[in-house]
A protein has these predicted regions:
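Ankyrin-repeat boundary/"N-cap" motif
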Residues: 4-15, 38-66, 89-114
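Short coil/turn connectors between adjacent alpha-helices in alpha-solenoid helical repeat scaffolds
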Residues: 23, 61-75, 105-125
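Ankyrin repeat domain, specifically the short helix-to-loop turn at the C-terminus of the second helix
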Residues: 27-38, 73-88, 120-126
Length: 126
């Protein structure tokens, strides 16, 4: 499924999530904290209503499937996003984590790659 960000900053942040580049992602979120709160402008609504106007953190779930895989360090990527959200006092962090948790729990890629349990632990422990 194609979920293509139209904003270049969001597109780059999603690429960093997909690459598992925690350091570059943390720097980007520090430089552009709006990425933590804004909805990702996407080219169309091909992903359906449950992923309409997604938040950046939702992309860690790989649900809907975009690449069919997750980086080995995806739990650390989530930690980097959570730390940035706390640093920038993101008011809706709890709601964002809850929705991300639902995407992780219901997604096949996280389950099939062995990332589901570590992601659930990070998301529920935050």
């Amino acid at each position: 499924m194609s979920v293509e960000a139209t904003d270049p900053d969001f597109k780059r942040a999603i690429e960093l999530i997909d690459a598992g580049d925690c350091v570059a992602l943390a720097k980007m979120l520090d430089a552009h904290p709006r990425l933590l709160v804004d909805r990702v402008p996407v080219a169309d609504d091909a992903a359906g209503a449950y992923f309409a106007n997604p938040k950046l953190i939702w992309f860690v779930a790989e649900n809907p499937v975009r690449n069919g895989t997750l980086p080995d360090n995806i739990a650390n990527v989530v930690i980097a996003i959570i730390e940035a959200a706390r640093k920038h006092a993101v008011a809706e962090l709890k709601a964002d984590l809850d929705y991300t948790l639902a995407l992780v729990a219901s997604g096949r890629v996280a389950r099939e790659t062995g990332a589901q349990e570590p992601l659930i632990q990070v998301l529920t422990g935050a």
